[in-house]
């Protein structure tokens, strides 16, 4: 692996999200609310691995029940078993897109208004802007870095220590529960990747511990010293690329995606999308418009974290999906054959580790560099209908 590729992997690993944790008013045991707790959370980690400090911080303001702690964002319980970055892209990604669009629209409106002002005002504004720019250019690199960080809004999360929503979320009584879940998903990904789990079974106890400790402590070198052993030596050793497509906080969609096509040409991201049939995710797009907001406001549970794909919904999930389908029947729903056609026709955005790679990117290269610690490549689809709904309801403040 080249030093360039190594730098990319390390940069992806070091990606972080600024989070503000606020204690739920229902959990207060005193009249004084504690100040929020801020944290830079690694995208590739899991909430139970980083929230021990949050528990300690709020312990003086509430009765902390360790096995009852859960997190919520705008009425949505956060699934602890998904990587933090995947949760952020799935739930907050729509709002980020909307805020950018709104800011652009506001800027355009302001520009139009400014154009109607007289020339003297315009000249004064330009001079002031130039002076400000000159002053800004004299700032040091630290200030520039701070400006970059501040461009990303904080993720405001509410912390609860009672009334655990176990109809929605898996129980997580301790860190060992996270390790067990992680190990099971890791085995699943490697079975998809190579047709067996021999490489995982061949890890000795020290290597298994280093893999877990590297993830838990967010230690890139320790984690990758073991995880690299789970990567095939060549592209020809792959059976399939382990991917998970996430749409509207529904259970992951998993399709068997080979590295090469029938002509032994490496698949690109564009080819990958063309191999995901529209019918495998079309029902998930019904979770939109007012029905989406109504379900969130009524605290209706999202799909169960026990589900590994769209065919394994539990009874709660089925009842929700049936009610959504009944109220979201479209008389003239457009027909698409696959995900690629849907993306191009609707200009839908997709996120992998928080960015949108080119459709011409090699699928296996993305997997090896943008993959997550559980050895899956998570692709988050931003549903355009969800964006429009949020715009119409002005629900962009978070």
Curated annotation (Swiss-Prot):
Keyword Thylakoid on entry: no
Region (Disordered): 99-147, 292-321
Localization terms from the record: Cytoplasm; Preautophagosomal structure membrane
Membrane-protein topology: Peripheral membrane protein
A GO CC term assigned to this protein in UniProt: Atg12-Atg5-Atg16 complex
Cross-link Glycyl lysine isopeptide (Lys-Gly) (interchain with G-Cter in ATG12): where in chain: 187
Purpose of the protein: Involved in autophagic vesicle formation. Conjugation with atg12, through a ubiquitin-like conjugating system involving atg7 as an E1-like activating enzyme and atg10 as an E2-like conjugating enzyme, is essential for its function. The atg12-atg5 conjugate acts as an E3-like enzyme which is required for lipidation of atg8 and its association to the vesicle membranes.
Protein name (database record): Autophagy protein 5
Organism lineage string: Eukaryota, Amoebozoa, Evosea, Eumycetozoa, Dictyostelia
Gene: atg5
